[in-house]
Amino acid sequence: MVSPENVLIRNENMKASDTSYWYALRVTYSREMMVKKHCDANNIINFIPLEYRMCERNGVIIKKLQPVIRNLIFVKTSMSCINELKRKYPIRYIMNRGTGDPVIVPEKQMLDFIAVAGNYDQQVVFLAPCELRTKTGSRVRIRDGIFKGVEGVLVRVRNNKRVVVQIEGLVMVATHYIHPSLLEYLE
């Protein structure tokens, strides 16, 4: 699991072309876990949103950690490193429809997303971007608890007010119910 503290490690002597950003990548044929193993072995920071699901194997029901969205992985590295990765594995950039450039996720947005989505034991809810399209809420920051420092939008999801963190156009994750005394309104 990637923690926000591990993501903050930086190398100040990098060239401009080797600057690391968070890229959203599509991995074809459900090979995201294979790409994750390769990235972990080569010290490339990566994140796959995972959740526990009940599966049946040989008549026994087991709880297994599986990707929430098939074929999606976030990688923090340089463009040249991703091009090397593309030679070994069937991956593609997720492109911004407006500009035609690869989607680059801002650091703060990704750290907030990891803080919520990387917490497998909590009751978080993953949502498709279209599920909250018509709802708008207040921007808030969580002041205390396991999600301390996370910024998102306060929205009613499944009959509870939850803080929703999103990667624009790709995926959203909502925290469990957060008591109003733990919220700081930003707007």
Predicted regions, residues:
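Short coil-to-beta-strand transition motifs
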Residues: 134-136, 143-150
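Short beta-strand-centered aromatic/proline hotspots
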Residues: 149-157
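Acidic-enriched and Gly/Ser
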Residues: 1-136, 154, 161-187
